[in-house]
Amino acid sequence: MRIYKDIITGDEMFSDTYKVKLVDEVIYEVTGKLVSRTQGDIQIDGFNPSAEEADEGTDSNVETGVDIVLNHRLVETYAFGDKKSYTLYLKDYMKKLVAKLEEKAPDQVDIFKTNMNKVMKDILARFKELQFFTGESMDCDGMVAMMEYRKVDETEIPIMMFFKHGLEEEKF
């Protein structure tokens, strides 16, 4: 299994257990699904709640959301009120990525710059439809992933987008 981590914060962003598609050599599109999970439902062998008082058992909470977000502890951020603030973040973040690429993979710099401009124009055109997520550390200096819902066979499917060059792959 491969885990993809933010190269700036070290936060786990997603794994290869999902359907992953590379777009224009710069964006990973990861297909998620809406899930509901019960938390706090504890089963103990030999424990018979009916033999106790009437108010026994544990409270259970149902957690609902996109599996990628829940499994990798991503946190929704509302840091970008408008397209302009997101564009400012992107310019700063792209500078950080170019510096990292020049250091570790100089052959990728031109590919990144060329293709990222094309991809970001497309993404900025859909800005109002996007949700934004940071890693568990909630550090906006690192990667802010994007999510949108796309209609596939009459069903809304959550698609998360991550910058390929902002991730490091860890094999388990």
Swiss-Prot record:
InterPro entries: Mss4-like_sf, Mss4/transl-control_tumour, TCTP, Translation_control_tumour_CS, Translational_control_tumour_p. The keyword rRNA processing does not apply. Transmembrane segments: none annotated. Residues 1-172 form the TCTP domain. It is found in: Cytoplasm. GO terms for cellular component: cytoplasm. Its main location: cytoplasm. The keyword Cell membrane does not apply. It holds the Pfam family TCTP. PROSITE patterns: TCTP_1, TCTP_2, TCTP_3. Keywords: Calcium, Cytoplasm. One of its GO terms (molecular function) is calcium ion binding. Belongs to the TCTP family. Involved in calcium binding and microtubule stabilization. This is Translationally-controlled tumor protein homolog. It comes from Lonomia obliqua. The gene is Tctp.
